[in-house]
């Protein structure tokens, strides 16, 4: 994948970093709330356009997100996923995420960095 665009935002709750692939086919956001979760970055909005899926782009974007977590001295990465999206839950497990909690709608997962 070519270079990615990183954009950092400061919010009242912390900081977020947006990562977009150079061709615009994929993006991910990593949020840091050091008051509530001082050692865990939160990965959200990982998306790949449908025509570019199953080519490793999502894995590369996730690696960028995990690298950003490490750069911010996080020791864990967290995310939520729709519990009905079995394929995606299994994909996150293959990437090393483990179940932290669940309710009837979503699964919270965590990965040690």
Specify the residue positions occupied by each region the protein language model found.
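Acetyl-CoA-dependent GNAT
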Residues: 1-45, 49, 64, 68, ...
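Short, conserved structural micro-motifs that define repeat-unit consensus positions
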Residues: 27-29, 53, 80
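Methionine-biased hydrophobic packing positions in alpha-helices, especially
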Residues: 61-62, 74, 109
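Conserved active-site alpha-helix within GNAT-family acetyltransferase domains
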Residues: 59, 71, 83-101
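Conserved acetyl-CoA-binding loop-helix of GNAT-fold acetyltransferases
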Residues: 48, 54-67, 93-94
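Conserved GNAT acetyl-CoA-binding A-motif
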Residues: 69-80
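Conserved beta-strand-loop-alpha-helix junction that forms the acyl-donor binding cleft
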Residues: 79-88, 106-110
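Terminal substrate-recognition subdomain of acyl/acetyltransferases
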Residues: 98, 104-113
């Amino acid at each position: 994948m070519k270079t990615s665009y990183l954009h950092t935002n400061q919010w009242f709750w912390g900081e977020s970093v947006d990562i977009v692939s150079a061709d615009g086919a994929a993006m991910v956001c990593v949020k840091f709330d050091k008051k509530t979760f001082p050692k865990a970055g939160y990965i959200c909005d990982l998306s790949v356009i449908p025509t570019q899926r199953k080519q490793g782009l999502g894995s590369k974007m996730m690696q960028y997100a995990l690298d950003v977590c490490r750069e911010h001295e996080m020791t864990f990465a967290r995310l939520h996923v729709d519990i009905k999206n079995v394929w995606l839950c299994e994909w996150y497990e293959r990437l090393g995420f483990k179940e932290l909690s669940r309710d009837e709608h979503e699964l919270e997962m965590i990965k040690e960095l």
